[in-house]
Amino acid sequence: SGRTGIVLTTPEFLSIHRDRFARSGRIGFVVIDEAHHAGLAKGGDRSAYLDMPDILKALGDPVVMAATATATAPVVAELARMLPITRTVVDETVRENLQLEDDRDLASRENRLVSIVATGEKTVIYVNSRDQSVALAKTLRKRVPDCATHIAFYNAGLARSDRRRVEEAFRDGSLSCIVSTSAFGEGVNLPDIRHVVLYHMPFGGIEFNQMSGRAGRDGQPAVIHLLYSSRDARINERLLDCYAPERDELVTLYRALQTMWRSNRGKTGDDSFSASDIDIAQMCLAIDARTPVDERSVESGLGIFEELGFCRVSGFDDTRRIAMAENPGRVQLSRSIRYLEGLRSRMEFSAFRSWALDSCASDMLAKVNRPIVPRA
């Protein structure tokens, strides 16, 4: 009807409802913020971005602008191919208001964290899992009782309305400390963050810059605190292993899926079965008690198998159904983009790990102060 001029949406919503948007005939300009996600989508991160070429064609090929402060040359090349984009504008502004306090491998990082939170200044603490965000927020409320009502956790598992309430409370000063996964701060204008704490090690250079760069966006002095350790690196490596399980793990997972599929078909006659990631991981352990397969490996493995044509997955969570291919034949793992991207992520983290643990503080601050941009 023309009553709405601007629509804010996610790539997933746009992908699902592309035909409805196309029927309006009114989409002339598409802006993709935090566009590095689109450039990294081949690894299974926000895979709806991979639909962008078809979406834009359905919308009548509108003008497209992509914006990000963290885009390497390969990411820019992928964005240009996907969207497509013919012109790149680079702003190499250098920030001068940030300090970096290096407390890597500190004996008691929790004590150091308590002293930061006790200042009452706006603080964002980044951890690597939803469970950790909840647990650390609970710990800080106990250890800094004067600030207990001003501390909250934030992660993608919260309802959108709850996330919005946390953001607004932090913005208006009702909250002074947020313990979060990388979900907090992206796409939200929060200029007056005085402390950013990397409690756990980020997964790569882009994430390091994204998190650290959220400090002091108002131009006033702000501090980045490095509290991660070499122990965190080992945890990250295990998490990344889940995204690209080893061949032996995938063999065990495939045997488990086949066992559950055949058992269910024998009992019910149904060609598909329903099982949680935990159920499947337990079946893997029953087959091989030494397997490292867990629920995270199951999720990644299912994605790889579906890509290779070994299975078909429909629905989500409790409604998910899995159907195995009768005779899929032999297929090389290298034909799975998801598997290859998982291997690439592991290799990239290996290089980042050395930099994140061994670089001097001045070099690390210089990396934050300069945006990640494509270099000639």
PLM-predicted stretches and their roles:
Residues 1-16:
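Inter-Walker segment of RecA-like/P-loop motor cores
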Residues 3-6, 26-29, 60-65, 122, ...:
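Loop/turn-to-beta-strand initiation segments
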Residues 10, 68-70:
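Conserved phosphate-coupling serine/threonine residues in phosphotransfer and NTP-handling enzymes
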Residues 12-13, 19-63:
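SF2 helicase catalytic motif II
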Residues 14-15, 37-46, 73-74, 187, ...:
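Catalytic P-loop NTPase motifs of RecA-like helicase/translocase cores
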Residues 58, 70-118:
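Interdomain hinge/linker at the junction between the two RecA-like core domains of SF2 helicases
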Residues 120-138, 147-182, 188-376:
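C-terminal helicase lobe
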